[in-house]
Structure formats: C-alpha cells, structure tokens
Design a protein with these regions (language model features):
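Short helix-boundary/capping micro-motifs
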Residues: 11-30
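Secondary-structure junction motif
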Residues: 186-208, 229, 271-279, 286-295
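Flexible hinge/capping segments at coil-to-helix
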Residues: 156-193, 272-273
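A short LG(V/I)-centered, amphipathic sequence patch enriched
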Residues: 41-60
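Hydrophobic hinge/microswitch elements
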Residues: 129-134, 138-142, 148, 195-250
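Central regulatory/effector-binding core of bacterial HTH transcription factors
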Residues: 91-153
Length: 305
C-alpha cells in the first residue's frame, strides 16, 4: 500500500524540481525524503527517478504517479476539511433570516429537522423581509435567508437560491366586500411590505385599476383585522392565511397569482457544512409543508387576468 507521506514527497519533488527544495517544503532532511522516494519506488515496483547531473528528475512513470498523487492529496485535504466542518456543524450556530409568514409556517419545520439531525447546531433566527434579509446575507450578518419573489428572477450576484414552494395569493375582504379582483377600483386597499405592495400594484393594473392604498402593515394579523373592520381589501399569501385566519374576513384564491418561496445562501465553495445543513433542512421543511387552503366563504375564486 502506498504511504501518503511518500506520495507527498513525490508530489513536492514534481512541483519544486529538487530533493532539497522538497525536503525544505516538507520540513524533513534530504536524506529522509530520499528514503521516502526510494520506498515509494519499491512499493509501486516502478522506476520513478533517474539521475540528472548532480540531481534527479522524474521518469514518465514518476510524472504520472505525481499527477495522480496530487489528486489523491487534494481529495484527502477536502475530506479533512469536511470532517472538521461536520464537527463544527454538530456543535455550532447558524443565522437564518426569515419573513413573518415564513417564521409562522415554515421555520418551525426547519428547526425540527435541524434539531433531529444535528441537536448541537443552534439556529439563530432574524426577522427580516426579503430586501433586508438579502442585504444582511451579502454583508455576512446571516448565513442564509428565506425569501420570496413574484417573478422568476435570480437572487443576485454572489448569491444562489433553492426553490422551496409556490405560495398562492388570495383576495381578502370583509363580508359584503368585492368578490372579484377586477372590481378592485371599488374599494381601498390594505397593503404590506414593499414587495407585496409592488405586487398589488401589478395585479391591479393587470386587472384594469390602480389600487388606492388606505393603510400599510407588514403584520398579516393586523392586515386581516383592518380588512375585517371594513377599512379595505387586501392580497395575502397562503402561508400567512394558514398561520392565522381572522374569522371576520372572506378569502378567495387568485388564479395564476403566486409567489416563489426560496432559501438563499452565498455562492461560495467550499461552503461550511453547517450552512449546507441549514439549506437542506429548509428544502425538507418545504417539501413537508402542506399549506392549508383557506376556506372560501362564498364560493368561487376571485379570478384575475
């Protein structure tokens, strides 16, 4: 069997050109490196070196073994780093940014998966809507972020996203309110975060009206309370309605309107195993999440477009 240290001596000789340089790089004497090379030649049964003046040079067999040896050493180095990373993942901390409805519906599943597989890994939760969450991710303040978008775009330079699920949008009204999104000009609207507001504007324009905003709140519980009080209508995603449903509102699904929910991490390689563990836990939680379709109080959908 080939000894790793002997293989490393051959690789260093190939890289540096002389036994003395290889010995200095490895921290051994020239005599020790020469013995290692001779032992490697005996172990393989191949002539690896030939005399060249006062020094030596690699034979064709020596060059071939050195090239393959570099691959083996690289693999060993990666394996060692992964083992260290795994040990840290089993007893460390990762930071996850998440928007409110994800905290209520998706994050509990993420924490459950991590807790079962890596009980020593602590997940620190940071509340943040997508723009702020992605900015925190780029700045290294969090390790991953749960995000959403209403168009199929990438997360941005230096980031990579993994699709988790598609979240249907619902028209939320008080009893006696509008029943079709096309009638949106007849009422005022309660809107949410910046991205949610942009989507409301886009949906409204696609259905022939520009929404008149009455109030804005990132809190989906508050939004439903305002709708129930007759302040206006709202668009809310299924994740929010599955986490909390006010008894005083009616909901109708919007055909063809949904948002893409994803987990985003920095596109770095190699990446700490703890972050990979967190991303995979998000994928597992996404697969397990069964978004309860909110009951439609009056029947039918609020067809859009």
């Amino acid at each position: 069997m080939i000894d790793v240290q002997q293989l490393r001596a051959l690789v260093e000789l190939s890289r540096l050109g002389t036994v003395s340089a290889a010995a200095e790089s490895l921290g051994f004497s020239q005599s020790t490196v020469s013995h290692q090379l001779a032992a490697l030649s005996r172990a393989t049964g191949a002539v690896l070196l030939t005399r060249a003046g006062r020094g030596v040079r690699l034979t064709a067999e020596g060059r071939a073994l050195a090239a393959r040896g570099q691959e083996v050493l690289d693999l060993l180095d990666r394996t060692e780093r992964e083992a260290v990373s795994m040990a840290r993942a089993e007893a460390g901390r990762v930071r996850l940014a998440a928007f409110p409805s994800a905290v209520a519906s998706l994050v509990p599943g993420v924490l459950d998966v991590v807790g079962q597989q890596y009980p020593g890994l602590e997940v620190e939760l940071v509340d943040a809507e997508p723009p702020e969450a992605l900015d925190a991710l780029r700045r290294g303040r969090v390790d991953a972020a749960l995000s959403f978008s209403y168009i199929d775009d990438d997360a941005g330079e230096g980031l990579e996203s993994v699709h988790l699920l598609d979240d249907v949008l619902y028209l939320v009204t008080h009893p006696g309110g509008i029943t079709r999104i096309a009638d949106g000009a007849q009422c005022r609207w309660v809107t949410g975060c910046a991205r949610c507001h942009e989507e409301l504007i886009a949906v409204g324009r696609a259905n022939g009206f520009t929404p008149e905003t009455a109030y804005a709140s990132d809190d989906y519980v508050a939004v439903q309370a305002l709708v129930a009080a007759g302040v206006g209508a709202a668009l809310l995603p299924g994740m929010a309605l599955s986490a909390y449903r006010h008894e005083g509102v009616q909901v109708r699904p919007l055909a063809r309107e949904q948002r893409r929910v994803e987990v985003v991490a920095r596109a770095e390689r190699p990446r700490p195993l703890a972050i990979d563990v967190l991303v995979e836990a998000c994928r597992t939680a996404g697969r397990r999440t069964s978004l309860r379709r909110p009951a439609v109080r009056t029947g039918g959908s609020a067809a859009s477009r």
